[in-house]
Regions:
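N-terminal catalytic or cofactor-binding beta/alpha core of small enzyme domains
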Residues: 1-152
Length: 152
C-alpha cells in the first residue's frame, strides 16, 4: 500500500484513502489482534490472541481490497476487539468483555470505571472520531451498516 494513501493515528486507528472520491466509507472494527505491551496480552495465551476471539482474521484484507476496488475511504481499528470492541458504545458490557466465546479474558475482569474510561478515551474515541471525519467529508443520503457473517 502506498503511504501517501494512508494516515495513521498511532496503532489505534488507520484511515486508508482519506480523500477518496467515492461516497462509500468502509469501516473494519475487528481488523487487528494487536495489544500494546502495557496490557500484558490481557493474560491470554498466544493461541487465543491469534484466534477469532481477538479479531476477525482476513477482515482487513477484504476491507482493503474493497477500498481499492471502490476507491473508497476505509477506517480500520488497529487494536484487538478484546481491548475495546469499537462497534460497541462505552456503556456496553461487551465493549471490554470479561468473557468472549469460550474464553475468560483475565485482563478485563473487574475493570474499574477509571480503567474503562481510560480505554474508551484511548481506543474508542479516536476510532469514532476517524469514522466521523470520514463520514463528515461526504454528502450522505443514508447509511447502510453491513456485517457479513460466515455461514453457520
Amino acid at each position: 500500500m502506498n503511504h501517501s494513501q494512508t494516515q495513521d493515528a498511532g496503532q489505534v486507528v488507520r484511515t486508508v484513502r482519506p480523500g477518496a472520491p467515492s461516497p462509500v466509507v468502509l469501516v473494519c472494527e475487528h481488523a487487528s489482534a494487536f495489544m500494546p505491551a502495557s496490557f500484558d496480552n490481557l493474560g491470554l495465551s498466544e493461541d487465543v490472541r491469534r484466534s477469532h476471539v481477538a479479531w476477525d482474521p482476513g477482515a482487513l484484507g477484504v476491507a482493503e481490497a474493497l477500498s481499492a476496488l471502490l476507491d473508497a475511504t476505509l477506517v480500520a481499528s488497529g487494536i484487538s476487539r478484546l481491548l475495546y470492541d469499537c462497534n460497541r458504545p462505552p456503556e456496553a458490557e461487551g465493549a471490554m468483555p470479561a468473557r468472549s466465546e469460550i474464553y475468560d479474558i483475565p485482563g478485563n475482569v473487574g475493570l474499574t470505571e477509571a480503567q474503562r474510561k481510560a480505554r474508551t478515551d484511548a481506543f474508542y474515541r479516536p476510532f469514532r472520531a476517524a469514522v466521523g471525519a470520514a463520514l463528515g467529508s461526504r454528502r450522505v443520503g443514508g447509511y447502510a451498516h453491513l456485517r457479513p457473517r460466515p455461514p453457520a
